[in-house]
Amino acid sequence: MTATLLTAEQLSSVAEKLPGWTLADQRLRRQWRFRNFVEAFGFMTRVALLAEAMNHHPEWSNVYATVTIELTTHDVNGLSDRDLKLAEAINLLEPG
């Protein structure tokens, strides 16, 4: 699937379309805090399966109960429509 670099207009509306995500340096970033490591790892597992199905993979880190995800598309050197779709799908996985 070919990625399309987002326009300046599309970038300006990212915050309202993606609650919880921040935009900086051509990356979308979001952090989650869970009650414990098992919950954090369970969330990461669900995201991993989703990312694999979408063939678009996040940059992420996990420290105990905190998961941080950053999205960017290296092929276009910035944010693409694929990043938006993955962020929207990840938001649907949120607990609670």
From Swiss-Prot:
Record keywords, A-Z: Lyase
Gene Ontology terms, MF aspect: 4-alpha-hydroxytetrahydrobiopterin dehydratase activity
Enzyme class, UniProt record, top EC level: lyase
EC code: 4.2.1.96
Catalyzed reactions per annotation: (4aS,6R)-4a-hydroxy-L-erythro-5,6,7,8-tetrahydrobiopterin = (6R)-L-erythro-6,7-dihydrobiopterin + H2O
UniProt xrefs under InterPro entries: PCD_sf (IPR036428), Pterin_deHydtase (IPR001533)
GO annotation, biological process: tetrahydrobiopterin biosynthetic process
NCBIfam families the UniProt entry points to: PRK00823.1-2, PRK00823.1-3
Family according to the record: Belongs to the pterin-4-alpha-carbinolamine dehydratase family.
Protein name, entry field: Putative pterin-4-alpha-carbinolamine dehydratase
Organism: Prochlorococcus marinus (strain MIT 9303)
Lineage, top ranks: Bacteria, Bacillati, Cyanobacteriota, Cyanophyceae, Synechococcales
